A protein has these predicted regions:
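Core subunits and conserved enzymes of cellular information-processing
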Residues: 2-241
């Protein structure tokens, strides 16, 4: 007759079996969630792509109709700006310094998004000598997030390596993947503030070819680098990513 197995050993085996089953179940559920999240992210990307194409087609139609009737097509005013700090703190007034802190531009070559309204436009004009800014395309937003994107989780700077980082940071407001995040920023959606605050300021590099000391002091419209450069900001970002 085989010796009786001590009760303590039986309990230990039962506990180990339970832990093993729980681990397998957790692994299975995690894989299922990952598949579901991936499917949802693909669906979101397809939905937004269709939306972007429809908007572009509508703009083309409006331009053609305006031209056919001898009128002018006036596009909607930009709602989003990308700001890049190009100068240090020497000679910066306390007010300008406070505005740059508000926009989270604490270092040279930091870049952040800002929602354009009367208040932010006034603030941008006050800091024009120290920054350059303009209107980013969807492609530029994508490149910044994919190549230089870091999120803020528990006050820590975390690389956006996959959608799980986005889900943890802003999933509560329905932003669950890169496509959601890009769409919220590009369209300046209802949860723009949460999306923008989740993003750590982008750390760009000195542009290929560099900024000269003289051109940084001159407005873009006068041949320099500072101030509003409109859609030309996209060319600059390509040189700084």
């Amino acid at each position: 007759m085989a010796p009786a197995i001590p009760e303590s050993v039986l309990k230990k085996q039962a506990t180990q079996t339970k832990i093993s089953l729980q681990a397998k179940q957790a692994s299975y559920e995690a894989k299922q969630k990952k598949r579901a999240d991936k499917k949802e992210a693909i669906a979101s990307a397809e939905k937004y792509t269709a939306e972007y194409k429809a908007a572009e087609a509508a703009a083309i139609t409006n331009r053609r109709e305006a031209k056919a009737t001898g009128g002018f097509y006036v596009p909607a005013m930009p709602k989003l700006a990308l700001i890049i700090r190009i100068r240090g703190t020497i000679g910066v007034s306390p007010k300008a310094k406070k505005i740059m802190q508000l926009f989270r531009l604490r270092q040279i070559h930091n870049a952040t998004f800002v929602k354009l309204n009367e208040s932010t436009i006034r603030m941008l004009r006050l800091i024009e000598p120290y920054v350059t800014y303009g209107y980013p395309t969807r492609s530029t937003i994508e490149k910044l997030i994919y190549k230089r994107g870091f999120g803020k989780l528990n006050k820590q700077r975390i690389p956006i390596a996959d959608n799980s980082v986005i889900q943890e940071g802003v999933g509560a407001v329905g932003i669950k993947c890169c496509a959601d995040l890009i769409h919220e920023l590009y369209t300046v959606g209802p949860n723009f503030k949460e999306a923008n605050n989740f993003l750590w300021p982008f750390k760009l590099t000195s542009p290929r070819g560099g900024f000269s000391t003289k051109t940084k002091l001159v407005h873009f419209l006068e041949g320099g680098e500072a101030g509003n450069r409109g859609e030309e900001i996209n060319k600059l970002v390509k040189r700084m990513i």
